[in-house]
Amino acid sequence: MTLNEKKSINECDLKGKKTLVRVDFNVPVKGGVITNDYRIRSALPTIQKVLNEGGSCILMSHLGRPKGISISEAAAVRSAGKVPGYEEAATLRPVAQRLGELLSKPVVFAPDCLDAADVVKKMSPGDVVLLENVRFYREEGSKKEEEREAMAKVLASYGDIFVSDAFGTAHRDSATMTGIPKVLGHGAAGYLMEKEISYFSKVLGNPPRPLVAIVGGSKVSDKIQLLDNMLQRIDYLLIGGAMAYTFLKAQGHRIGTSMCEEDRLDLARSLLKKAEDRKVQVLLPVDHVCHTEFKAVDTPVVTADADIPDGHMALDIGPKTIANYVETIGKCKSAIWNGPMGVFEMTPYSKGTFAVAKAMGDCTQKNGLMSIIGGGDSASAAEQSGEATRMSHVSTGGGASLELLEGKTLPGVAILDEKV
């Protein structure tokens, strides 16, 4: 699978136009306060481009998973003086305030995304409007295309141009991701979307070799398609996290009370056979950091080899495994990482994950390694380890990056115009 280049915001005539930008402002909010504004900051270059070119910007996003109401129920709610579908925990109002601070200019907040025509009419070049959470309406994520289209038609009526900068939701067929470009008949990629497409097309197309995939997380079953697809492309596979114990048991090792998918042992064996047939070198843990319970302790047990003692569960890769994995990363020219090596949220079990992050950061800076972190837990681990800024690319999309690595097409990318 190759990802074709998409029409860029650079190729759009933005002057005097109202540009609808689908962003991903799904940020963590506690008590009305944003605890991490990384996703807001990531969208700034695209927003600034629209404003610098003499256009105005209408921003759309979701936040969280509100219940939402249907468009047909909205009129009655509005006539009662309320905002349709409103949930305080999911409002984008704090985001409008933070965005205004980052842009050093006021951002107008439209409290009902489907009743914002009057707000939009008053816009002048240089203005920024943020619409309230698009998921306050069920049609945003409806399974029925006609329902998504009904919502998309209202939103499309606000603007002239559609730009998508929300890679994090590119795997979803929604009113704002695929509906609006269908209604308008066009769509371009913002800078963040462009960067994501560029890096994933490199790693899935013709990457500098050798290419290593570092795959962790808890379940083999969650990563079957990813492993199957990536085994056609990679030179090395490093396996960590709880999924490693299913592979080790499949090879006949003792795994104590470690997490294991007993019904996936044959699958693990078939994946290892596939790797052998394709001449992919697979590295599994040769030692472990263990404890009798799932909790942080000052002195966890480090095993001498790949076998885990009875009554113990492995919670991180051990020092010999770390050395093997770091050495392998050092041999490579490209690396893609999806899933932690252990329970990195607990300090005693974070060494494996953070060592992989550091090795990738070091090799990127010193050897020119092309390093890509698939979003989700791996992105959080890269952030926590302090290595995120030393990587080539940390993806903003957990689910979207996983689906790309599985070889799937992302609806929110496919709908955009091809680069001419």
UniProtKB/Swiss-Prot annotation:
Organism this protein belongs to: Trypanosoma congolense
Keyword hit for Flavoprotein: no
Name of the protein this chain belongs to: Phosphoglycerate kinase, cytosolic
Any Pfam family: PGK
Domain of life, per lineage: Eukaryota
Main location: cytoplasm
Biological processes per GO annotation: gluconeogenesis; glycolytic process
Record's subcellular location: Cytoplasm
Residues annotated as binding AMP: K219, K223, A242, A314, E345
